[in-house]
């Protein structure tokens, strides 16, 4: 009889612990919702100018991607007068996407070195973050605050 009581208490303790762990998790999102993050970036962060969303075909060309490289893409860019932009890419191959983004940044750096040298500082430390199956790139005049906002989004 005592063993039944002990077993019930152990089961209850384990069940309670499991519920606590499942409810608290690690305090991070299970995945990035592109539209939500884009809204947060546009509403709560000040870029050098208002960014415009581009369609997936334009984003593919811009970042040298093909449809097989990503599952979803959401990109906002400025005019050619500024480097500011951000892109959210859901993919099965984050490594390949990051490689393409780095190539894109190298070319952009070369172009802006001659064209708009005052924009170069933004390109020296761009944000490229990988979270699960998503890659996020942000180029702005205040990458520290942009990164902080992105990380706050992940915690919610």
Label each residue range with its predicted role.
Residues 1-10:
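Positively charged n-region of N-terminal signal peptides that target proteins for export
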Residues 9-17:
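Sec-dependent N-terminal signal peptides
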Residues 22-25:
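C-terminal motif of bacterial Sec signal peptides marking the signal peptidase cleavage site
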Residues 27-29:
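Bacterial signal peptide processing site
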Residues 52-81, 96-97, 123:
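Short, compositionally biased low-complexity segments enriched in polar/charged residues
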Residues 83-94:
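A short acidic-to-branched-hydrophobic micro-motif
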Residues 94-132:
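Short Gly/Thr-rich strand-loop-strand
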Residues 119-156:
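A short, solvent-exposed beta-edge/loop patch
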């Amino acid at each position: 009889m005592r063993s039944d009581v002990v077993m019930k208490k152990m089961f209850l303790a384990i069940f309670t612990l499991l519920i606590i762990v499942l409810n608290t998790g690690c305090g991070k999102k299970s995945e990035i919702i592109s539209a939500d993050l884009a809204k947060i970036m546009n509403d709560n962060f000040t870029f050098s100018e208002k960014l415009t969303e581009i369609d997936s075909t334009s984003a593919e060309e811009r970042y040298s991607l093909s449809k097989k490289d990503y599952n979803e893409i959401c990109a906002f860019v400025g005019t050619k007068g500024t480097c500011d932009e951000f892109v959210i890419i859901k993919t099965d191959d984050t490594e390949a996407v990051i490689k393409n983004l780095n190539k894109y940044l190298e070319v952009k750096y070369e172009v802006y070195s001659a064209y708009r040298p005052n924009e170069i500082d933004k390109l020296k430390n761009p944000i490229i973050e990988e979270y699960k199956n998503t890659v996020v790139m942000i180029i702005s005049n205040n990458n520290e605050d942009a990164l902080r906002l992105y990380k706050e989004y992940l915690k919610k």
